[in-house]
From Swiss-Prot:
It comes from Legionella pneumophila subsp. pneumophila (strain Philadelphia 1 / ATCC 33152 / DSM 7513). The keyword Metal-binding applies. The keyword S-adenosyl-L-methionine does not apply. Residues 1-163 are annotated as: Histidinol-phosphatase. This is Histidine biosynthesis bifunctional protein HisB. GO terms for cellular component: cytoplasm. Zn(2+) binds at residues 91, 93, 99, 101. It comes from the Bacteria. Pathway: Amino-acid biosynthesis; L-histidine biosynthesis; L-histidine from 5-phospho-alpha-D-ribose 1-diphosphate: step 6/9; Amino-acid biosynthesis; L-histidine biosynthesis; L-histidine from 5-phospho-alpha-D-ribose 1-diphosphate: step 8/9. Mg(2+) binds at residues 8, 10, 128. It is found in: Cytoplasm. GO terms for molecular function: histidinol-phosphatase activity; imidazoleglycerol-phosphate dehydratase activity; metal ion binding. Residues 164-352 are annotated as: Imidazoleglycerol-phosphate dehydratase. The active site is at residues 8, 10.
Length: 352
């Protein structure tokens, strides 16, 4: 689904002149950092829509031709750098006209909005005024300001990182799972489960996956650890799947890893299709209080919730090392598969 940035012009894309009217070429100056930021956001799959209030176009104070020359020059500047706007909406009225198209009202965009399906949760208004914030509220999308202290670099980083995080609360009669992930964060994860070995394994996934994982898990261990491990895997898969959004630009595939005498190999495809094949033999019933039969089940539950195909095989003699290798290689595979290094969706179907 389309992700849209509704971007103001004066004060956001170009510097606001002293008289608040861009009516001559010598008044045009791009805002600092706007080009690299928009290129980064464009690569991340965002569509750009320009929405601007231009007071009194066509009046003696602001002739149509003066506006047109400057506006075309601005568009040419951006297009010369590979930045294009899918649509441009300009309100020519003054506040006194009390029109339906002047921001923060949305009348100017109504025909476009009726014909366009887009992901509001991943779309933003970017502007320098309070009216831009109100405009975002009226559209039902997010907002980020541009100012001397909140730069385009900060805006691009915030949008890209925000688009790749998710939280899942899973509460059943057997377990309570509170989990969140942020895929583009190198913060130290905070993981708390009542099974220390399982906690340690999840720390390996987050560390080697290069993402921030926050987890608080509790369950009916007096019955069995099955429910806790299964529900944690389901919550983790759901959270990563949500955080990936439309999967635009991801690598999709990944990875292999040795550990001491153990060797774990994995092939993962975040395709939207669930399948898991786990090959490995454990002769011990428990490792660190965790049943070894739950290792394959963790990967199967994760595969189902994530919507991924996972093939994993592990060999070795030290069961701790074998299991740890499985979780580390999962992290490495997720890091590779979730990384965004493309500017397209890696599927000929057009959807993952």
């Amino acid at each position: 689904m389309k992700k849209i940035l509704f971007i103001d012009r004066d004060g956001t894309l170009v510097e606001e002149p002293f008289d608040f009217q861009v009516d001559s070429l010598d008044k045009i100056k791009l805002t600092s950092g706007v080009i690299p930021a928009l290129l980064q956001l464009q690569k991340a799959g965002f569509t750009f829509i320009m929405v601007s209030n231009q007071n009194g176009i066509g009046t003696v104070a602001f002739p149509e031709e003066d506006f047109a020359v400057c506006h075309e020059f601005i568009l040419d500047l951006f297009s010369s750098q590979g930045i294009l706007f899918d649509e441009i909406f300009i309100c020519p009225h003054t506040p006194e006209n009390n029109c339906i198209c002047r921001k923060p009202k949305t009348g100017l965009l109504e025909p476009y909005l009726k014909e366009t399906v887009f992901a509001k949760q991943y779309s933003w208004v970017i502007g320098d005024r309070d009216t831009d914030k109100e405009f975002a509220d009226n559209l039902g999308v997010n907002f980020l300001p541009i100012s001397k202290t909140h730069t385009w670099e900060m805006v691009a980083s915030a949008i890209i990182n925000d688009a790749r995080k998710a939280s899942v609360q899973r509460k059943t009669k057997e377990t309570t799972i509170d989990l969140s992930v942020q895929l583009d964060s190198d913060q130290t994860s905070v993981i708390d489960t009542p099974i220390p070995f399982f906690t340690h394994m999840l720390e390996q996934v987050a560390k080697h996956g290069g993402f921030d994982l926050r987890l608080q898990a509790s369950g009916d261990l007096e019955v069995d650890e099955h429910h806790l491990i299964e529900d944690t895997a389901i919550a983790l898969g759901e959270a990563i799947r949500t955080a990936l959004g439309d999967k635009w630009g991801i690598n999709r595939y990944g990875y292999t890893l040795p550990m001491d005498e153990s060797l774990a190999t994995i092939a993962i495809d975040i395709s939207g299709r669930s399948f898991c094949d786990f090959k490995g033999q454990f002769t011990r019933e428990f490792i660190g209080g965790m049943a070894t039969e739950m290792i394959p089940h963790f990967f199967q539950s994760l595969s189902s919730a994530l919507g991924a195909t996972i093939h994993i095989e592990v060999t070795g003699t030290n069961h701790h090392h074998m299991i740890e290798a499985c979780f580390k290689v999962l992290g490495r595979a997720l890091r590779q598969a979730c990384s965004r290094t493309n500017n397209y969706l890696p599927s000929t179907k057009g959807v993952l």
